[in-house]
Amino acid sequence: MIQQESYLSVADNSGAKRIQCIRVLGTNRRYAHVGDVIVAAVKDAMPNMGVKKSDVVKAVVVRTKATLRRDTGNSIRFDDNAAVIINADNNPKGTRVFGPVARELRERNFTKIVSLAPEVI
């Protein structure tokens, strides 16, 4: 579960390495899970890229360390908390996505992120 001030790694090549959650988007939401959109501040970034340190960005959570329970009874858990930075049209800013992403992103209409990901779990 991601909440305010949680740190996440960035799973794309937009230029940011780590982001800190500022707010979970939605009506009075406290926690974010896989597929939720957050507002975050860039805490660590690579030089000469599209995103700079201290930029405020929107991102979608693609992996969480908290257990994700599916309707089939399966549960899945990732090794890290990760997000992909998105623009206003919910398309990723980067051109590549690193690491596996959860299948729930397809249900939330983030099909571009799912198509860029090397593995969908």
Swiss-Prot record:
A Pfam family of this chain: Ribosomal_L14
GO CC terms, sorted: cytosolic large ribosomal subunit
Keyword rRNA-binding: yes
KW RNA-binding (keyword) present: yes
Keyword entries, A-Z: Ribonucleoprotein, Ribosomal protein, RNA-binding, rRNA-binding
Listed CDD domains: Ribosomal_uL14
UniProt superkingdom: Bacteria
Record GO biological process: translation
Single GO MF descriptor: structural constituent of ribosome
Coiled coil: none
UniProt cross-references to InterPro entries, sorted A to Z: Ribosomal_uL14, Ribosomal_uL14_bac-type, Ribosomal_uL14_sf
SUPFAM superfamilies found in the cross-reference section: Ribosomal protein L14
Subunit structure as annotated in this protein's UniProt entry: Part of the 50S ribosomal subunit. Forms a cluster with proteins L3 and L19. In the 70S ribosome, L14 and L19 interact and together make contacts with the 16S rRNA in bridges B5 and B8.
Family the UniProt entry places it in: Belongs to the universal ribosomal protein uL14 family.
Described function: Binds to 23S rRNA. Forms part of two intersubunit bridges in the 70S ribosome.
Protein's name in the database: Large ribosomal subunit protein uL14
Upper lineage: Bacteria, Bacillati, Cyanobacteriota, Cyanophyceae, Synechococcales
